[in-house]
Amino acid sequence: MRKIERQMNAAITNAKDWCSGNTQVCWDGAAQVAEVFLHGNLIAKIGSCWIQIFDGGWQSNTTKSRLNAILSEHGLPGECVFQKNFNWFVSQEGGAVPFFSGMRLN
């Protein structure tokens, strides 16, 4: 995991606003939700017992890396985003499902 991704996860865990380079975490205290942005595009919302993931309009390696860092720290064991034949999928306990922007993981 990259240093920026460790810092991003620390901000999410500690419910803090944080920004470095192209990545930003905004903490919404009223909703108790962390929102993660990459290049100003929303890529994740993290609640107390759920994660909602987005591609931000760009299915890039950087987006996938940030999402996987979030899932490794805040998701369930084995959850990850991967690419096969140019299509994104989410690996979960029950197997792989096609990725769609806005999908919610519990």
Question: How would you label these PLM feature ranges?
Answer:
Residues M1-N106:
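Terminal leader/tail segments of proteins
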